[in-house]
Protein backbone atom coordinates (compact mmCIF):
# COMPACT_ATOMS: atom_id res chain seq x y z
CA UNK A 1 0.00 0.00 0.00
CA UNK A 2 1.10 3.63 -0.54
CA UNK A 3 2.59 5.05 2.68
CA UNK A 4 1.28 8.43 3.84
CA UNK A 5 3.52 8.84 6.91
CA UNK A 6 6.28 7.10 8.87
CA UNK A 7 6.62 7.66 12.63
CA UNK A 8 8.92 6.72 15.50
CA UNK A 9 6.90 6.09 18.67
CA UNK A 10 9.09 5.48 21.76
CA UNK A 11 7.95 3.94 25.01
CA UNK A 12 8.22 6.74 27.57
CA UNK A 13 7.88 6.24 31.32
CA UNK A 14 6.47 9.13 33.35
CA UNK A 15 9.85 9.73 35.00
CA UNK A 16 11.48 9.95 31.53
CA UNK A 17 9.04 12.49 30.14
CA UNK A 18 10.98 15.63 31.09
CA UNK A 19 14.07 14.29 29.32
CA UNK A 20 12.10 13.75 26.12
CA UNK A 21 10.61 17.24 26.29
CA UNK A 22 14.08 18.78 26.70
CA UNK A 23 15.45 16.68 23.82
CA UNK A 24 12.55 17.72 21.59
CA UNK A 25 13.21 21.38 22.44
CA UNK A 26 16.85 20.97 21.44
CA UNK A 27 15.70 19.41 18.16
CA UNK A 28 13.66 22.50 17.39
CA UNK A 29 10.22 21.34 18.54
CA UNK A 30 9.58 24.21 20.92
CA UNK A 31 6.02 23.31 21.93
CA UNK A 32 6.40 19.54 22.36
CA UNK A 33 3.86 18.13 24.81
CA UNK A 34 2.07 14.83 25.30
CA UNK A 35 -1.37 14.81 23.68
CA UNK A 36 -4.12 12.20 23.53
CA UNK A 37 -7.30 11.22 21.71
CA UNK A 38 -10.52 11.88 23.61
CA UNK A 39 -13.64 9.71 23.19
CA UNK A 40 -14.74 11.78 20.19
CA UNK A 41 -11.41 11.22 18.43
CA UNK A 42 -10.26 14.80 19.00
CA UNK A 43 -6.68 15.60 20.04
CA UNK A 44 -6.37 17.11 23.53
CA UNK A 45 -3.68 17.51 26.19
CA UNK A 46 -2.95 14.15 27.83
CA UNK A 47 -3.68 13.32 31.42
CA UNK A 48 -0.82 12.08 33.61
CA UNK A 49 -0.05 8.39 33.06
CA UNK A 50 2.63 5.94 34.10
CA UNK A 51 3.57 5.27 30.48
CA UNK A 52 3.16 6.97 27.10
CA UNK A 53 3.76 6.10 23.45
CA UNK A 54 4.06 9.53 21.80
CA UNK A 55 4.89 10.32 18.19
CA UNK A 56 8.45 11.64 18.51
CA UNK A 57 9.59 11.73 14.87
CA UNK A 58 7.40 11.77 11.77
CA UNK A 59 7.88 12.13 8.02
CA UNK A 60 6.74 13.97 6.05
CA UNK A 61 7.19 16.47 8.87
CA UNK A 62 5.51 19.63 7.59
CA UNK A 63 2.13 18.01 6.90
CA UNK A 64 2.11 15.98 10.11
CA UNK A 65 3.90 18.03 12.79
CA UNK A 66 0.62 18.52 14.66
CA UNK A 67 0.84 14.83 15.58
CA UNK A 68 4.15 15.22 17.45
CA UNK A 69 3.60 14.21 21.07
CA UNK A 70 0.35 12.37 20.32
CA UNK A 71 0.12 9.30 22.58
CA UNK A 72 -0.95 6.50 20.23
CA UNK A 73 -1.88 4.27 23.17
CA UNK A 74 -4.68 6.70 24.12
CA UNK A 75 -6.93 5.28 21.39
CA UNK A 76 -8.34 1.72 21.79
CA UNK A 77 -8.08 0.81 18.08
CA UNK A 78 -4.44 1.81 17.86
CA UNK A 79 -3.57 0.38 21.28
CA UNK A 80 -5.00 -3.02 20.33
CA UNK A 81 -2.70 -3.19 17.31
CA UNK A 82 0.27 -2.02 19.39
CA UNK A 83 -0.35 -4.73 21.98
CA UNK A 84 -0.66 -7.37 19.26
CA UNK A 85 2.64 -6.25 17.75
CA UNK A 86 4.46 -6.05 21.08
CA UNK A 87 3.31 -9.51 22.19
CA UNK A 88 3.95 -11.27 18.88
CA UNK A 89 7.10 -9.51 17.73
CA UNK A 90 5.44 -9.05 14.33
CA UNK A 91 3.93 -6.05 12.51
CA UNK A 92 0.26 -5.51 13.40
CA UNK A 93 -2.30 -3.34 11.61
CA UNK A 94 -5.22 -1.43 13.07
CA UNK A 95 -8.80 -1.78 11.99
CA UNK A 96 -10.11 0.94 9.66
CA UNK A 97 -9.32 4.45 10.92
CA UNK A 98 -10.40 7.91 9.84
CA UNK A 99 -7.43 9.53 8.09
CA UNK A 100 -8.65 13.03 8.91
CA UNK A 101 -8.06 12.23 12.59
CA UNK A 102 -4.84 10.28 12.15
CA UNK A 103 -2.98 12.58 9.79
CA UNK A 104 -1.82 16.13 10.23
CA UNK A 105 -2.69 16.89 6.62
CA UNK A 106 -6.22 17.01 5.20
CA UNK A 107 -6.32 13.37 4.15
CA UNK A 108 -9.72 12.09 3.11
CA UNK A 109 -11.22 8.67 3.55
CA UNK A 110 -10.10 5.73 5.63
CA UNK A 111 -6.82 3.93 6.10
CA UNK A 112 -4.85 1.86 8.58
CA UNK A 113 -1.74 2.04 10.74
CA UNK A 114 0.84 -0.71 10.97
CA UNK A 115 2.98 -0.90 14.11
CA UNK A 116 6.35 -2.69 14.05
CA UNK A 117 7.78 -3.38 17.53
CA UNK A 118 11.38 -2.47 18.40
CA UNK A 119 13.13 -4.21 21.30
CA UNK A 120 16.37 -3.66 23.21
CA UNK A 121 19.42 -4.87 21.34
CA UNK A 122 21.59 -7.75 22.51
CA UNK A 123 18.79 -9.16 24.68
CA UNK A 124 17.50 -12.71 24.23
CA UNK A 125 13.73 -12.61 23.78
CA UNK A 126 11.73 -15.82 23.60
CA UNK A 127 8.31 -15.18 25.13
CA UNK A 128 5.58 -12.59 25.54
CA UNK A 129 6.72 -11.37 28.97
CA UNK A 130 10.27 -10.75 27.74
CA UNK A 131 8.92 -8.88 24.71
CA UNK A 132 6.85 -6.59 26.94
CA UNK A 133 9.76 -5.96 29.33
CA UNK A 134 12.23 -5.14 26.55
CA UNK A 135 9.95 -3.11 24.29
CA UNK A 136 11.59 0.18 23.27
CA UNK A 137 8.87 1.50 20.99
CA UNK A 138 7.34 1.19 17.53
CA UNK A 139 7.93 2.24 13.98
CA UNK A 140 4.51 3.09 12.54
CA UNK A 141 3.36 3.34 8.93
CA UNK A 142 0.14 5.13 7.97
CA UNK A 143 -1.36 4.07 4.66
CA UNK A 144 -4.51 4.11 2.57
CA UNK A 145 -5.08 0.82 0.72
CA UNK A 146 -7.51 2.41 -1.74
CA UNK A 147 -4.69 4.51 -3.22
CA UNK A 148 -2.78 1.42 -4.28
CA UNK A 149 -5.85 -0.34 -5.67
CA UNK A 150 -7.03 2.73 -7.59
CA UNK A 151 -3.57 3.26 -9.07
CA UNK A 152 -3.37 -0.34 -10.27
CA UNK A 153 -6.88 -0.24 -11.76
CA UNK A 154 -6.04 2.83 -13.84
CA UNK A 155 -3.56 0.71 -15.80
CA UNK A 156 -6.26 -1.85 -16.71
CA UNK A 157 -9.12 -1.67 -19.19
CA UNK A 158 -12.59 -1.35 -17.68
CA UNK A 159 -14.33 -4.70 -18.22
CA UNK A 160 -17.24 -4.37 -15.80
CA UNK A 161 -16.11 -5.54 -12.34
CA UNK A 162 -17.09 -4.08 -8.95
CA UNK A 163 -14.37 -4.53 -6.33
CA UNK A 164 -14.86 -4.75 -2.56
CA UNK A 165 -12.35 -5.04 0.29
CA UNK A 166 -13.54 -6.33 3.68
CA UNK A 167 -11.90 -6.69 7.09
CA UNK A 168 -13.06 -10.02 8.58
CA UNK A 169 -10.77 -10.05 11.63
CA UNK A 170 -13.53 -9.93 14.24
CA UNK A 171 -15.06 -13.14 12.93
CA UNK A 172 -18.56 -11.75 13.54
CA UNK A 173 -19.46 -8.91 11.23
CA UNK A 174 -17.09 -8.03 8.40
CA UNK A 175 -16.33 -4.35 7.84
CA UNK A 176 -16.23 -2.91 4.34
CA UNK A 177 -13.09 -0.80 4.04
CA UNK A 178 -13.08 -0.13 0.31
CA UNK A 179 -15.44 -0.17 -2.67
CA UNK A 180 -14.58 0.48 -6.32
CA UNK A 181 -17.62 0.53 -8.63
CA UNK A 182 -16.84 -0.49 -12.18
CA UNK A 183 -15.92 2.41 -14.44
CA UNK A 184 -18.45 1.01 -16.92
CA UNK A 185 -21.36 1.95 -14.64
CA UNK A 186 -23.37 4.97 -15.70
CA UNK A 187 -25.21 5.36 -12.41
CA UNK A 188 -24.30 5.51 -8.73
CA UNK A 189 -24.96 2.32 -6.81
CA UNK A 190 -25.21 1.40 -3.15
CA UNK A 191 -22.22 -0.65 -1.97
CA UNK A 192 -23.32 -4.07 -0.74
CA UNK A 193 -22.38 -5.79 2.50
CA UNK A 194 -20.49 -9.08 2.40
CA UNK A 195 -23.59 -11.11 3.30
CA UNK A 196 -25.46 -9.61 0.34
CA UNK A 197 -22.61 -10.50 -2.02
CA UNK A 198 -22.87 -14.13 -0.93
CA UNK A 199 -26.59 -14.25 -1.69
CA UNK A 200 -26.42 -16.19 -4.95
CA UNK A 201 -24.22 -13.67 -6.77
CA UNK A 202 -21.43 -14.68 -9.09
CA UNK A 203 -18.19 -13.51 -7.45
CA UNK A 204 -14.48 -14.17 -7.03
CA UNK A 205 -13.15 -14.09 -3.46
CA UNK A 206 -9.58 -14.03 -2.17
CA UNK A 207 -8.79 -14.00 1.57
CA UNK A 208 -5.36 -12.84 2.74
CA UNK A 209 -3.44 -11.68 5.80
CA UNK A 210 -2.58 -8.01 6.22
CA UNK A 211 -0.22 -7.53 9.18
CA UNK A 212 -2.27 -9.78 11.42
CA UNK A 213 -5.68 -8.78 10.10
CA UNK A 214 -7.88 -10.96 7.92
CA UNK A 215 -8.79 -9.11 4.75
CA UNK A 216 -10.91 -10.35 1.86
CA UNK A 217 -11.16 -8.96 -1.66
CA UNK A 218 -14.38 -9.68 -3.56
CA UNK A 219 -14.86 -9.08 -7.30
CA UNK A 220 -18.44 -9.00 -8.62
CA UNK A 221 -19.49 -8.67 -12.28
CA UNK A 222 -21.37 -5.49 -13.18
CA UNK A 223 -24.03 -5.47 -15.96
CA UNK A 224 -21.45 -4.38 -18.56
CA UNK A 225 -19.45 -7.54 -17.92
CA UNK A 226 -22.33 -9.79 -18.99
CA UNK A 227 -23.14 -7.57 -21.97
CA UNK A 228 -19.57 -7.73 -23.17
CA UNK A 229 -18.95 -11.43 -22.68
CA UNK A 230 -22.42 -12.86 -23.32
CA UNK A 231 -21.55 -13.93 -26.88
CA UNK A 232 -18.43 -15.63 -25.61
CA UNK A 233 -20.20 -17.51 -22.83
CA UNK A 234 -23.30 -18.57 -24.80
CA UNK A 235 -21.72 -21.54 -26.68
CA UNK A 236 -20.35 -22.93 -23.43
CA UNK A 237 -23.73 -22.62 -21.72
CA UNK A 238 -25.42 -24.48 -24.60
CA UNK A 239 -22.74 -27.15 -24.53
CA UNK A 240 -23.04 -27.58 -20.76
CA UNK A 241 -26.83 -27.91 -21.07
CA UNK A 242 -26.44 -30.55 -23.76
CA UNK A 243 -24.06 -32.62 -21.65
CA UNK A 244 -26.18 -32.49 -18.51
Regions found by a protein language model. Name each.
Residues 1-219:
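Intrinsically disordered, low-complexity polar/acidic regions
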Residues 152, 222-240:
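Membrane-interface helix-start motif
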Residues 243-244:
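Juxtamembrane or sensor-core-proximal signal-transducing alpha helices
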